[in-house]
């Protein structure tokens, strides 16, 4: 395992340092070769670091900045007023070479915009996309993109997403000739928007890609495809629906029902009578799959959910470290040139 420095926007997310700082400590404890640059308000950060071991503290650098990018502002306003914010400074640290990757739970549109401006897309890529690993019910994994970076996409955009997703799956999931599917409202060739049908035609013509056809939302976790492609609007809605359903079912299993009389009954039934199903459901814990990567850029940028808890944000940090050590942007560029 090689030494690595990541830049964190610790002010991003719904709660900020009270989540991101404990997450940083979890990540450092699990990865002894990792160092972190913490961008944010030092008055909020330093009290959370008072009682940590010296060996851990020496791998942390607090970079004070008092400004943040608010989720309430639109993309144009956020970009115009981004100078000196925790998000921009974290990305600039990667641009300058002070860090090799960046993690933020802040405004998705601003993160996408600033990353494109400061880090630049890979040669030939029209639009970077948000990609995430998702679990399957059989214990496997798939990748899904775009998850919200690009709301409107044409056929060429979707084709490029499929290409990047295939290379990403090859290098992160160790898959050979990953199966690609387009997320659609039906499996028939005539279903869906024109852009999706046209993208299907492009994919069918490319023998280098293992395109298998359309996939419907009810089969996303069934392991029928290794790479699931959609525009950012559809992908974001689908992913959040999956995550919400998984969290609600897991809460039910753990006996968190509002009906106190049913709590013990549900918990006992699901952990004893349906034990095998319970073990499968535990694999679909959204916290363990927190973090979507902005692929198609020259460096690793990972977007955490704004509502992530400390364990989930720590997973996003670990994901950024893994991708950086695996040199995923370089491998995507090499793959693009090959195709």
From Swiss-Prot:
InterPro entries membership: FA_synthesis (IPR003664), Phospholipid_synth_PlsX-like (IPR012281)
Keywords, in A-Z order: Cytoplasm, Lipid biosynthesis, Lipid metabolism, Phospholipid biosynthesis, Phospholipid metabolism, Transferase
Keyword Lipid metabolism found: yes
BP terms from Gene Ontology: fatty acid biosynthetic process; phospholipid biosynthetic process
PANTHER family registered for this protein in UniProt: FATTY ACID/PHOSPHOLIPID SYNTHESIS PROTEIN PLSX (PTHR30100), PHOSPHATE ACYLTRANSFERASE (PTHR30100:SF1)
Oligomeric form and interacting partners: Homodimer. Probably interacts with PlsY.
The protein, known as: Phosphate acyltransferase
The species this protein was found in: Pasteurella multocida (strain Pm70)
């Amino acid at each position: 395992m090689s030494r690595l420095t990541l830049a964190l926007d610790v002010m991003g997310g719904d709660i900020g340092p009270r989540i991101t700082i404990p997450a940083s400590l979890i990540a450092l404890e699990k990865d002894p070769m990792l160092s972190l640059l913490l961008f944010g308000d030092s008055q909020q950060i330093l009290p959370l670091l008072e009682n940590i071991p010296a060996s851990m503290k020496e791998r942390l650098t607090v970079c004070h900045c008092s400004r943040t990018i608010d989720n309430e502002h639109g993309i144009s306003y956020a970009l115009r007023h981004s100078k000196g914010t925790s998000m921009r400074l974290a990305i600039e640290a990667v641009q300058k070479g002070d860090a090799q990757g960046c993690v933020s739970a802040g405004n998705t549109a601003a993160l996408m915009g600033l990353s494109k401006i400061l880090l630049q897309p890979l040669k030939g890529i029209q639009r970077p996309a948000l990609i995430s690993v998702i679990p399957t019910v059989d214990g496997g994994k798939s990748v899904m993109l775009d998850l919200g970076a690009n709301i409107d996409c044409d056929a060429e955009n979707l084709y490029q997403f499929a290409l990047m997703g295939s290379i990403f799956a090859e290098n992160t999931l160790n898959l050979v000739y990953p199966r690609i599917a387009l997320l659609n409202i039906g499996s028939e060739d005539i279903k869906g928007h024109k852009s999706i049908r046209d993208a299907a035609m492009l994919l069918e013509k490319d023998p280098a890609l293992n395109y298998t056809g359309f996939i419907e939302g009810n089969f996303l976790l069934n392991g029928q495809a290794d790479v699931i492609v959609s525009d950012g609007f559809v992908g974001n809605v689908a992913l959040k629906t999956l995550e919400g359903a998984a969290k609600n079912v897991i809460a039910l299993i753990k006996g968190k029902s509002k009906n106190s009389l049913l709590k013990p009954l549900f918990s006992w039934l699901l952990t004893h009578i349906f034990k095998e199903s319970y073990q499968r459901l535990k694999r679909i814990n959204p916290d363990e799959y927190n973090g979507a990567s902005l692929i198609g850029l020259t460096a690793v940028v990972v977007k955490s959910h704004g509502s992530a808890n400390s364990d989930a944000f720590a997973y996003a940090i670990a994901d950024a470290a893994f991708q950086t050590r695996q040199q995923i942007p370089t491998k995507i560029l090499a793959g693009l040139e090959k195709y």
